[in-house]
Amino acid sequence: MRKQLPKDFVIGGATAAYQVEGATKEDGKGRVLWDDFLEKQGRFSPDPAADFYHRYDEDLALAEAYGHQVIRLSIAWSRIFPDGAGAVEPRGVAFYHRLFAACAKHHLIPFVTLHHFDTPERLHAIGDWLSQEMLEDFVEYARFCFEEFPEIKHWITINEPTSMAVQQYTSGTFPPAETGHFDKTFQAEHNQIVAHARIVNLYKSMGLDGEIGIVHALQTPYPYSDSSEDQHAADLQDALENRLYLDGTLAGDYAPKTLALIKEILAANQQPMFKYTDEEMAAIKKAAHQLDFVGVNNYFSKWLRAYHGKSETIHNGDGSKGSSVARLHGIGEEKKPAGIETTDWDWSIYPRGMYDMLMRIHQDYPLVPAIYVTENGIGLKESLPAEVTPNTVIADPKRIDYLKKYLSAVADAIQAGANVKGYFVWSLQDQFSWTNGYSKRYGLFFVDFPTQKRYVKQSAEWLKQVSQTHVIPE
């Protein structure tokens, strides 16, 4: 049976400033935590990325032509405040006004993120999410944006806070590349929730006629077997990556079970509990009651089994299938059951995980009025065919199959009562990846990075049909 999406369900593509704009040294842009980190690695450069800084109109025209109603963008904090605070860079401000005007011209509603993995370098150097000064400057940057860009009606405070907190201090794949510091991870998680809450409360106090939400990376953890030990490992993994954020941002308080699981992880690693104050918890509670929507970024699921050895993370950054390792002392070891399909980067293809996460939010966090799927997609190794013309359409049947399965899971969740209002595919066009460079392509539109020419993929045509008909083809 063909699956239907609601008539008011919106579809679009997602981007992030650092991954698409390029122009990292143009028009007074300040440095961010990635610049030094990537230069020292010498593996790949964020310039020119997809050169969106100069080619945004071309990409927005493609989005419009292929049936999109919405688009996810982010503002690069260091284009507005090169140092994170203090002097404003007017050229950066002017760029975003032009970008948002182009969205209006192309009939695209922008959902704009304030922080998408790109802390200004000075604030990263003093502790990033562990620094109170950073948290204060973040709120002031948000205030500036709310006042400066009244044309934006859909704001997102932070993109995937869990990806930053865990990968900065536990797995070490994001700068400052520390490993095993669960105490720093949980303190960063709490501090992110506090900063988010203060920004939501600020936005609502300003009486602006728009919506504000947050975007979480939510990959569903399952037990590897039906043993109680494996179930507990899945619960601990859930506490590390999901539970604190869901409780804090969507319920306004940390559940006793969440805190007990976190204390267990920290005790196993002989690390102290994170600190929080009554004032912070009051702000968190107030914000949860005012939040307009939550964004769910879901790509894959995880399976956990009990593990009591040393922590070890091996990141598969080049698509060498089967090379990733993830085992954390005090939590568990990731191991996929037989028969689970994966990408070359070892990400499982398991749409049931999307359904279960959407239903979990619907059932366990009734305060939040709306859900958007703010990222979902598949990274593939893709190249241009030999005889390419400007009209070449690139076949990507694996992506179409993936999108069909995951959109069907979204439709099932809506049918079961979840108020999912829209879907953003990651990504609009091929982009620069933080830890994979240019080899992992997610776009609906192929970017030939040496020439910056765009080519349509068949998935763009497929999604256009879904957008126009609100029917997922069989």
From Swiss-Prot:
Keyword Hydrolase belongs to the record: yes
Pathway in which the depicted protein is active: Carbohydrate metabolism; lactose degradation; D-galactose 6-phosphate and beta-D-glucose from lactose 6-phosphate: step 1/1
Active site: E160, E375
Catalytic activity: a 6-phospho-beta-D-galactoside + H2O = D-galactose 6-phosphate + an alcohol
Transmembrane segments: none
GO biological process, one term: lactose catabolic process via tagatose-6-phosphate
Enzyme Commission (EC) number: 3.2.1.85
Sequence similarity: Belongs to the glycosyl hydrolase 1 family.
Classification via PANTHER family: GLYCOSYL HYDROLASE, LP05116P
Name the record gives this protein: 6-phospho-beta-galactosidase
Species name: Lacticaseibacillus rhamnosus (Lactobacillus rhamnosus)
Phylogenetic placement of the source organism: Bacteria, Bacillati, Bacillota, Bacilli, Lactobacillales
